[in-house]
């Protein structure tokens, strides 16, 4: 198998927002926005250095992103977000490094969200990863494969959750913003879904990539063989059922609602394997800063509870 070259291992913290922006460069950026209508236009760094870095390397990063997707998964993709960031290990300018994040949707049977990070290398940019075998990256495709396998059951749970929360006035982020999430896996309205992969890129392309392109019974059988060999791809499936509540709503009231919501959605969430969680965020989020889950930072702590648990 042909190897994709130019990878750089990254051990520093990637900053999702704009921690180093000068005030005069951010005066037009709103402090908080609503996920109902915000399109994500301010996500990323906005210092002069970020703008220069983005302009210089954007086209190359997009090309390398598309080449990686085609080589690793065998599909085309659509670019949703290209942002610049500044990473700092100290306070001096020399301690700061710049990079790009590219987020897109891979045109698979179950379209999936895919993120790559790039850093400067020579006169260009190279892909950087926290895992030598690209387990973080290939997990996006494995999630889509598992979603394809359990799609009727997952969709039933998602639509049940959607129905329950919408009739009580809760909602999800708009689709344009949803597609700009820095997430590896399947993103749907009210749901983020991912799982584990194997930490070996060459082995992934040899064993998983051919199965991705199968249909029907052939797909199910070959995927089951992979599950038997790598049980973590089923065992560690994660379904996050996500909703937002109005910024003026009482947090304790929402927390009580979430507790009761677990009971009404429990039966459908138990229909397929993996871990499920219900997460509510206050709809007063940063226009640029991301939280530890790579979602726009809410000004209130999340409300979360396990879902699909046996009584």
Tell where the protein language model's regions lie, with residue ranges.
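A short, surface-exposed beta-strand/turn
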Residues: 111-137, 270-275
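Hydrophilic extracytoplasmic domains
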Residues: 40, 45, 53, 270-311
